[in-house]
Regions:
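Active-site phosphate/pyrophosphate-binding segments
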Residues: 1-128
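Active-site regions of enzymes building and remodeling cell-envelope glycoconjugates
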Residues: 1-4, 167-180
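Short hydrophobic alpha-helical runs that function as membrane-insertion/retention elements
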Residues: 2-3, 108, 130, 156-159, ...
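Short, well-ordered loop/turn and helix-capping segments at boundaries between secondary-structure elements
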Residues: 24, 30-34, 105, 135, ...
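Cofactor-binding loop segments of dinucleotide-utilizing enzymes, especially the Rossmann-like FAD-
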Residues: 85, 134, 161
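Short, structured coil segments at secondary-structure junctions
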Residues: 103, 125, 152, 169-171
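Glycine-rich, anion-gripping cofactor-binding loops and their flanking helix/strand elements
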Residues: 114-150, 179-181
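Short, polar loop motifs at secondary-structure junctions
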Residues: 158-166
Length: 181
């Protein structure tokens, strides 16, 4: 086994366990990549980026008042969708789980590519969807998914990369996160 170094769990929502598991997977991927074709420079860049995560998390936490305001706006909603693609699918699943664990509000996480295969039928003006939509290789597909939800009058909360002001035109609310690799 691998010791996570997450420390003792104090609450039900074990976000630090999820975060430490992701960090371990990144380190494992770099180790395996270095044994194959990954260059030393690329491996170093990934490890340095991983070391930046605590500071980047502090930047997001500094937006506490903005996020509390959003929580108040949506507190009466009884259901939420969390949607992500590729590497952000586990983040969407974890986000839905955390909302359920902490607030006892029903939430489901889905791969955004599966939206048309059932979940879209649940979208209406009372069903907010949280999109994990950083500017990455599947960004345009996420924008298309957001537009599908908007066409059904569904409220959209986007988790987007700092500096992505275009997403404001199609999302009701945006929480910005720092740009990473």
């Amino acid at each position: 086994g691998v010791y996570q170094h997450a420390g003792p769990e104090i609450g039900v929502a074990s976000t630090k366990a999820f975060t430490s598991q992701v960090a371990i997977l990144v380190i494992l991927a770099v180790l395996l990549g270095r044994q194959r074709e990954m260059s030393y420079v690329t491996g170093q860049r990934l490890v340095k980026e991983l070391a930046r995560i605590p500071d980047l998390m502090r930047r997001v936490i500094a937006r506490e008042d903005e996020i509390k305001s959003l929580a108040k706006k949506y507190q009466s909603r009884g259901n939420f969708f969390f949607l992500g693609r590729k590497y952000n699918l586990p983040v969407a699943l974890e986000g839905a789980l955390k909302l359920k664990e902490i607030s006892y509000i029903h939430a489901e996480g889905y791969g955004a590519g599966e939206l048309k295969h059932g979940p879209i039928a649940m979208i209406d003006e009372y069903m907010p969807s949280v999109f994990i939509a950083p500017q990455d290789s599947v960004y345009e597909k996420m924008i298309s998914n957001i537009q599908e939800v908007r066409a059904r009058r569904g409220p959209v909360i986007a988790i987007a990369t700092e500096g992505d002001y275009d997403i404001r035109a199609i999302a009701d609310d945006v929480i910005y996160i720092p740009k990473t690799l």
